[in-house]
């Protein structure tokens, strides 16, 4: 598995509850651009329309050696999931007020582009502060243990 890009902001802004692996419908130049320069997750999210899941605002830069048929960098991209998974996502988003965000995009062992999406709940400001405090405490404990070995 070769990771192309990760959404680092997702882990600090959301509590990740479940993750799913989804295929993504891409054009030829998009795959070449992913191999060449990666992707940008800034402000990207998933939306469900007519029983299909779409990934919005994922920026895949244009392929340098492309021609007139080069792709639009921020076009909506359809995610490929099983129908049961889509129904489960619809239920969670509608009933519990959760959101679907992309966390990682990568090439699997067969060379196909996959997106890891997560069902997540947004963190409040005080939740973020608690996470920072926990991280600092763990860092201090580890530092103390290293010094006293």
Curated annotation (Swiss-Prot):
Query: Which keywords does the record carry?
Result: Cytoplasm, RNA-binding
Q: Does the record's keyword annotation contain Cytoplasm?
A: yes
Where is this protein found? Answer: Cytoplasm
Is Nucleus included in the keywords of this UniProt record? Answer: no
**Cross-referenced InterPro entries:** SmpB, SsrA-bd_prot, SsrA-bd_prot_CS
Q: GO annotations under biological process?
A: trans-translation
CC annotations in GO = cytosol
Q: Which GO terms describe its molecular function?
A: RNA binding
Pfam families in UniProt: SmpB
- Record family assignment: Belongs to the SmpB family.
What the protein does? Required for rescue of stalled ribosomes mediated by trans-translation. Binds to transfer-messenger RNA (tmRNA), required for stable association of tmRNA with ribosomes. tmRNA and SmpB together mimic tRNA shape, replacing the anticodon stem-loop with SmpB. tmRNA is encoded by the ssrA gene; the 2 termini fold to resemble tRNA(Ala) and it encodes a 'tag peptide', a short internal open reading frame. During trans-translation Ala-aminoacylated tmRNA acts like a tRNA, entering the A-site of stalled ribosomes, displacing the stalled mRNA.
What's the protein called, per UniProt? SsrA-binding protein
């Amino acid at each position: 598995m070769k990771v192309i890009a990760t959404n680092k902001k997702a882990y600090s802004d959301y509590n990740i509850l479940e993750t799913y692996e989804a295929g993504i419908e891409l054009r030829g130049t998009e795959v070449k651009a992913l191999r060449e320069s990666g992707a940008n997750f800034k402000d990207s999210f998933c939306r469900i329309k007519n029983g299909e899941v779409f990934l919005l605002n994922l920026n895949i830069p244009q392929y340098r050696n492309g021609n007139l048929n080069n792709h639009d960098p921020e076009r909506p991209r359809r995610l490929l999931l099983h129908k049961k998974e889509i129904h489960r996502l619809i239920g969670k988003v509608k009933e519990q007020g959760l959101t679907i965000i992309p966390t990682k995009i990568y090439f699997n062992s067969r060379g196909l582009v996959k997106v890891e999406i997560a069902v997540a709940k947004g963190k409040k400001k005080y939740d973020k502060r608690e996470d920072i405090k926990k991280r600092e405490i763990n860092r201090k404990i580890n530092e103390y243990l290293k010094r006293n070995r």
